[in-house]
């Protein structure tokens, strides 16, 4: 197995410098974004292209600063009980992009959608630390109001956990836990994410979505921290083919892209080294065994033997060569409270 790496080509420094040159000139960031998003509904979407856009449009109770530290998002502060099982979040008095107040009811509604099996979301498991979340997601409890979250008043949310969960605040930075505008979702149904309908609470709001062409976001004048948002417009360009996307970057059509063909990494390192950034990605690649039939079914010793035989250093250093790190477990490095597992045979 190998831990994943994130590759990024960016001319962002050049784009940002334009802000300093002219305080009144509109600054635009053109982002290559891989495949066309299927949806940008926070509780339904899955995949990196969708997440990139949603994190610009929506803000959860917590968020991260530039150093990846947990900081307040739409919740300006929170209290944690002595036993670590009760969190009380105090929301900012802010609004949705249509001017409607964002309240605790929107947070409760979003979390109930997240674990509702009828909604069809993929990330409800992130809320499993919350009381009754797993039972609701698995259909054992039908009443969504039994989820361990409630609005104490318009701007206070209380969450009850099954057990103390040290990483709970980290989980809340995921887009799937962001509040959604109940008044808009219930009015428009699945069409609520269309440009003419969508309402968001993040640093940006959507102004256009032309399928397979571009998605345009503009700085939101209702965002509580709008004065720190320095880029006026972000345009996401979907490109299914990585080679095409890198050509668009090199032609100056894109300011940044994460979609880089592995076979071009060496050339990019040699020729665009000041623009190429490779860093750890929170994920793990692995080989899976078919456990429904022989020889791997009911044969853990064989599976273990194959795992021992795989030279992870050869795979990461000679075959993929993008900078991945050898992996000896499913949990990648960088998880708070996790000590990297390295078995004795790794050094043989």
Predicted features, each with a name:
Residues 32-82, 112, 197-200:
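N-terminal lobe/hinge region of extracytoplasmic solute-binding protein
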Residues 35-51, 74, 122, 168-178, ...:
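A structural "hinge/loop" feature
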Residues 76-124, 158, 248, 296:
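Aromatic- and charge-enriched surface segment that lines or borders ligand/interaction sites
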Residues 104-110, 154-160, 202-203, 231-233, ...:
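Alpha-helical secondary-structure segments
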Residues 106-108, 119-183:
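Surface-exposed binding/hinge segments that line
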Residues 154-155, 163-229, 233, 241-243:
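Gly/Pro-rich hinge or "lid" segments in bacterial periplasmic/extracellular proteins
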Residues 207-218, 235-294, 317, 326:
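Extracellular/periplasmic solute-recognition and catalytic clefts
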Residues 325-348:
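Structural transition elements
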């Amino acid at each position: 197995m190998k831990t994943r790496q994130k590759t990024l080509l960016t001319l962002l420094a050049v784009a940002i410098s334009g802000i300093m040159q002219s305080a009144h000139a509109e600054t635009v960031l053109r982002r290559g974004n891989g495949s066309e998003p299927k949806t940008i509904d926070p509780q339904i979407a899955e995949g990196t292209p969708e997440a990139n856009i949603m994190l610009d449009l929506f803000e959860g109770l917590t968020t991260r600063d530039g150093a990846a530290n947990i900081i307040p998002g739409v919740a300006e502060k929170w209290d944690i009980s002595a036993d670590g099982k009760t969190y009380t979040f105090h929301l900012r008095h802010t609004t949705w992009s249509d001017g409607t107040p964002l309240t605790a009811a929107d947070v409760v509604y979003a979390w109930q959608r997240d674990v509702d099996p009828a909604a069809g979301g993929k990330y409800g498991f992130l809320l499993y630390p919350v009381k009754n979340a797993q039972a609701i997601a698995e259909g054992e409890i039908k009443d969504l109001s039994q989820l361990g979250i409630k609005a104490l008043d318009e701007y206070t949310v209380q969450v009850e956990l099954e057990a103390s969960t040290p990483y709970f605040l980290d989980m809340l930075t995921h887009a799937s836990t962001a509040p959604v505008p109940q008044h808009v979702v219930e009015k428009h149904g699945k069409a609520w994410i269309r440009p003419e309908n969508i309402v968001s609470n993040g640093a940006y709001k959507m102004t256009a979505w032309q399928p397979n062409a571009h998605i345009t976001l503009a700085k939101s004048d209702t965002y509580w921290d709008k004065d720190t948002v320095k880029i006026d417009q972000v345009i996401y360009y979907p490109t299914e083919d990585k080679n095409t996307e890198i050509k668009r970057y090199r032609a100056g059509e894109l300011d940044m892209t994460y979609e880089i063909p592995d076979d071009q990494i060496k050339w990019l390192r040699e020729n665009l080294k000041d623009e190429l950034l490779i860093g750890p990605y929170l994920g793990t690649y692995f080989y899976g065994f078919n456990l429904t039939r022989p020889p791997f079914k009911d044969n853990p010793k064989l599976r273990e033997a194959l795992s021992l035989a795989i030279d992870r250093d050869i795979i990461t250093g000679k075959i993929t060569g993008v900078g991945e790190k050898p992996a000896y477990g499913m949990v990648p490095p960088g998880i708070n409270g996790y000590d990297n597992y390295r078995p004795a045979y790794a050094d043989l």
